[in-house]
């Protein structure tokens, strides 16, 4: 399983090994997860020759069917039984991984380069807000850059997981802020309070429903979200706007974001080199000129 190894940054043991159509196997995705392997399939089974190769590694191999309920955890299909929870490293940063978790195992690998840039763009004295934070990976990188972070998510278990990730990296969670609830309502509250941030990360799910039943759809409401965040941005600050919504094209996404922040500079980074298949991730850096 040495594919893509030369493309991966140092001190990283969690990355994509095979990326579907980009590696000539549409619908099949293989991720190295420290000393475990996760193979995900969409609309197909694992090719027999690939399964044989995976089994030959001697590592625990897990299979996840993406067309099923996205909240179902992967199933181990080969290798020794090791703890389902473990620590992986990305660019020298440690994260808790949980193979028993549904939806995702604790980190989105396609955001690796964005996390590095968040760290580079963070500094002591800065405040960074991470909305829809999941397990707080962006927050950890920002804090390692010296910023004070606010980690915002609707789910308390995600905030607890984020605290664990801070601790894994020698960061005292009590020196950071954690907010539970709907991101839109928190942004409105921050704006009313005059609370601002030097950096804001917006990476919402494609579809969500808050605790009051209010629906959020990226293709309909992302621009409104960016406009709300704009009211909380310090002059000269930056935002990272991303979405994996496949219904929304890159140009439509750019247009939606640009309309919400007229006069701001918009730039787009390439995908990480181990993600060579579908260019599905919409992503824009927004800078206050």
List the predicted regions and their residue ranges.
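Non-catalytic substrate-recognition/targeting regions of SAM-dependent transferases
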Residues: 23-24, 28-31, 46-109, 116
């Amino acid at each position: 399983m040495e594919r893509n190894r030369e493309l991966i940054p140092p001190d990283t043991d969690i990355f994509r090994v095979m990326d579907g159509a980009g590696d000539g196997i549409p619908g099949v995705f293989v991720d190295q997860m420290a000393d475990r392997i996760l193979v995900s399939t969409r609309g197909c089974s694992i090719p027999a020759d690939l399964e044989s190769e995976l089994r030959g590694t001697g590592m625990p191999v897990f299979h996840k069917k993406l067309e099923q309920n996205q909240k179902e955890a992967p199933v181990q299909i080969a290798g020794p039984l090791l703890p389902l929870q473990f620590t992986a490293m990305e660019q020298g940063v440690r994260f808790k991984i949980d193979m028993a978790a549904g939806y995702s195992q604790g980190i989105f690998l396609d955001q690796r380069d964005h996390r590095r840039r968040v760290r580079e763009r963070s500094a002591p004295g800065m405040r960074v807000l991470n909305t829809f934070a999941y397990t707080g990976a962006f927050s950890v990188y920002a804090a390692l850059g010296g910023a004070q972070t606010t980690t915002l998510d609707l789910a308390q278990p995600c905030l607890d997981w984020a605290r664990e990730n801070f601790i894994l990296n020698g960061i005292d969670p009590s020196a950071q802020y954690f907010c539970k609830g709907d991101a839109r309502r928190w942004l409105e509250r921050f704006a009313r309070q005059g609370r601002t941030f030097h950096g804001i990360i917006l990476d919402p799910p494609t579809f969500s429903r808050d605790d009051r039943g209010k629906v959020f759809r990226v293709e309909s409401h992302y621009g409104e979200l960016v406009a709300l965040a704009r009211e909380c941005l310090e002059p000269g600050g930056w935002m990272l706007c991303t979405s994996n919504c496949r219904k929304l094209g890159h140009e439509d996404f750019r247009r939606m974001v640009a309309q919400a922040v007229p006069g701001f500079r918009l730039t787009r980074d390439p995908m990480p080199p181990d993600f060579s298949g579908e260019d599905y991730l919409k992503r824009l850096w927004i800078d206050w000129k």
